């Protein structure tokens, strides 16, 4: 049951989901058939099952949504998942109803943008070994392979590529953008602005920290990496989104990232804070109402059109100039 107070609408139910989203392993994430990722009947775009070879020799599998009836190459976007293993929809194994990346892809492709989303390495249909063994740098290389794939498609305008990253994905997007001038816009959702040890301390204070585990290469990088040093070098337009009830990354990190980007000389930065939204961009009050009304998980975990519209409006503006 959801519990309400004056400051935060919390729920053990939502808590369990978020813990799984952020900390669970790849075990149990199925290789779903292409039909699972097919658009709804009548959608003005197609969904194609695609394979992407990485420089390390891993085969990643994903879905490319492409607008129908195009007469010229269209802009393309790649979606970047957070720090836990997920399929291409950003779903954990036990809660496939959470499909934020499907929602984003649908909204963008309905408006003329091609979108590539991929199962994390070692998860779903993708190869590459255990996801937990991959460092942030290696994950960035996976996304670079996706960028190369998009640029090689005749349907895609290789000069109009954008990135949308959530959580760790919001660390990866700037890492790529500062080294690839073909990336012309990035969206950072719930992105950290401090080293990982500070994030871990915050999570411990909110009671959301995962179980202690032995240090691995991913954790070593996460603890030492300073996102602000990279943010200062970003030159493309940036949209920063954050929920003010984020239990994983403090909401003030949004403005810290924006300040760092502007400090580096890039003034094309937009910040949107969503009152009542958590790290997964779930509106907690709306989730409370839906659960009380007996709505299914697919409805409870659906991201509000408010968030989706902010993303799609901004991306369309920046990529179709």
Predicted regions and their residues:
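Short, surface-exposed "cap/lid" segments of acyl-processing enzymes
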Residues: 69-73, 77-107
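Primarily recognizes the serine-hydrolase "nucleophile elbow" in alpha/beta-hydrolase
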Residues: 145-203
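Alpha/beta-hydrolase active-site loop
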Residues: 100, 132-154
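Catalytic active-site module of serine/aspartate enzymes centered on a nucleophile-bearing elbow/loop
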Residues: 287-321
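Mobile cap/lid helix-loop segments that gate and shape the active-site cleft of serine hydrolases
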Residues: 184-185, 198-229
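N-terminal cap/lid segment of alpha/beta-hydrolase-fold proteins
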Residues: 33-72
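Short beta-strand/loop motif that positions the catalytic acidic residue
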Residues: 234, 240-242, 246
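Short alpha-helix in the alpha/beta-hydrolase fold that links the catalytic acid
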Residues: 236, 250-260
């Amino acid at each position: 049951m959801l519990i309400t107070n004056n400051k935060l609408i919390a729920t053990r139910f939502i808590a369990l989901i978020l813990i799984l989203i952020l900390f669970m392993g790849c075990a149990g994430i199925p290789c779903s058939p292409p039909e699972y990722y097919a658009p709804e009947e009548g959608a003005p775009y197609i969904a194609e099952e695609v394979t992407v070879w990485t420089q390390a020799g891993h085969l990643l599998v994903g879905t490319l949504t492409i607008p129908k009836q195009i007469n010229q190459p269209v802009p393309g976007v790649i979606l970047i998942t957070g720090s836990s293993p997920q399929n291409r929809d950003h779903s954990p194994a036990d809660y496939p109803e959470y499909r934020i990346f499907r929602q984003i892809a649908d909204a963008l492709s309905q408006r003329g943008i091609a979108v590539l989303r991929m199962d994390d390495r070692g998860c779903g249909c993708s190869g590459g070994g255990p996801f937990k063994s991959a460092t942030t740098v290696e994950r960035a290389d996976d996304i670079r392979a996706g960028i190369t794939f998009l640029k090689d498609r005749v349907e895609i305008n290789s000069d109009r590529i954008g990135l949308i990253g959530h959580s760790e994905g919001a660390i990866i997007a700037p890492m790529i953008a500062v080294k690839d001038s073909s990336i012309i816009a990035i969206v950072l959702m719930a992105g950290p602005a401090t080293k990982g040890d500070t994030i871990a301390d915050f999570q411990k204070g909110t009671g959301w920290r995962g179980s202690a585990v032995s240090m691995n290469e991913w954790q070593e990088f996460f603890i030492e990496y300073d996102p602000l040093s990279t943010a200062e070098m970003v030159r493309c337009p940036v949209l920063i989104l954050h929920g003010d009830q984020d239990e994983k990354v403090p909401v003030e990190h949004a403005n810290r990232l924006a300040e760092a980007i502007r400090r580096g000389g890039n003034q094309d930065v937009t910040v949107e804070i969503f009152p009542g939204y958590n790290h997964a961009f779930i509106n907690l009050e709306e989730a409370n109402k839906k659960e009380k009304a007996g709505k299914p998980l697919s409805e409870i975990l659906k991201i509000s059109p408010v968030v989706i519209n902010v993303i799609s409006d901004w991306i369309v503006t920046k990529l179709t100039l």
